[in-house]
Amino acid sequence: MTDKKALAEMLSRNRLFDELTKKDVRALVNSAMEVEHREGRTIVVEGNPGVGFHLIIDGTAIVSRNGRKLRTLGPGETFGDIAVIDGGPRSASVKAETRLRTLSLPQWEFKPLLLKHPQLAYKMLVKLCALLREAEKRPPV
């Protein structure tokens, strides 16, 4: 198990959370749990409802859409960022390429955290808007 200070540091380096205060990041880490996924396990299925957010601690994962590989994720990267907020369907599938450890934050833990820390919700909203604008500028795949 990874110590919470190291997890908080890893989370704060992620572009979605890099502007949060140390207190906000600690609150996220304290509400999350570490999960181990075996190699080859499908963690997220495209089209299924989103129930949580994952920060990769160790290992690699493959992101695919319509059976086509989009990218590989590694330590410090996340998936499920938007689904944890809106619970909407997953836009892609994610499969453990190697043994994978993630810090997982389910939606039911995340929502009360946002209500308790409204500044966290605002900071994430601003960051998600920036990510959306960036995505809109990319050519279609």
Regions found by a protein language model. Give the residues of each.
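Cytosolic regulatory regions built on CNB/CRP/Popeye-like sensor folds
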Residues: 1-141
